[in-house]
């Protein structure tokens, strides 16, 4: 009870109170490290069948995005289904997002975290923004949660093939590829690099969120936009309803996907079904990367197994709490995961008949 009280209070701190935020982080650090140590010591040996008492912390992102409410949904499910008998609890906390979540898991301040797929790849390989700290060899995947679907839309008069290669021919044009320093512009930069394009040199970048980006395309202020998100995306719906045939939603060919992915095995094919958006009469073939649930390799196999099993046996519960989880399906549980599976998650997936590729088996 004390743990739940502190978790709830500290995760709802005033973002403008810097002193309070620091004190909250210090307190959270103390209690989460204690909880993590207690959980591991209580189990004694990894993989024991008996589920000992544990209270885990799930780090998400800011309260205004999707990560936080999905984290609350997951932690609520664990509390309702596992805490009464198995004594496995979970509390969701807000954070600065994927980058901080990697650090929190590494330092034992959180035992689970929601990560963008590309950031998981950076963590696994020690590249990008994690080049200085190196590979996070302790990081493990639990499940894909929902997918960030890549949505490239350009002015119709710039569309030659109607595929992603059209973007590579817009050198010198104004493009809206996300806010500055955002995950959106980071993933767009990685994808374009795979196609041989340095976005900072090739384009006149307009830094904006999805709504303003869509408006800029409709008004002719930019030649193209990219809005990776769950579908349907509100800004895209509004754009296609208003702009009609003056814009073109680009398809991604298998060859373009392979080049853009750059050997990461992160982006996978995704079909936006006809009728998803206004005026969309045909399927759109694009690609998507996962937002996924990560954990620490040292967590007990039995606990991660039970959490994974509980998630997939109670999808209607999750989906009733937040619509983003409607994308979850056992068939897509390991799609695009960038780091090896935790043995507990692997065990559950093998039980339900999912074939695990070698790259996702922890060594």
What do these predicted regions represent?
Residues 132-151, 276-284:
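A structural signal for short loop-to-beta-strand junctions that line the ligand-binding cleft
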Residues 91-103, 198-215, 231-234:
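Short helix-initiation/N-cap motifs at beta->coil->alpha
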Residues 248-306, 348, 356-360:
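C-terminal lobe and pocket-closing loops
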Residues 45-51:
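Sec/Tat signal peptide C-region and signal peptidase I cleavage site
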Residues 75, 106, 114-132, 189-196, ...:
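A ligand-binding cleft/hinge motif common to bilobed small-molecule-binding domains
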Residues 10, 24, 229-251, 302-363:
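An extracytoplasmic/periplasmic, membrane-proximal ligand-sensing/linker region
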Residues 26-36:
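Bacterial N-terminal signal peptides that target proteins for export
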Residues 55-84, 148-219, 335, 339-344:
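Bilobed "Venus flytrap"/periplasmic-binding protein-like clamshell domains
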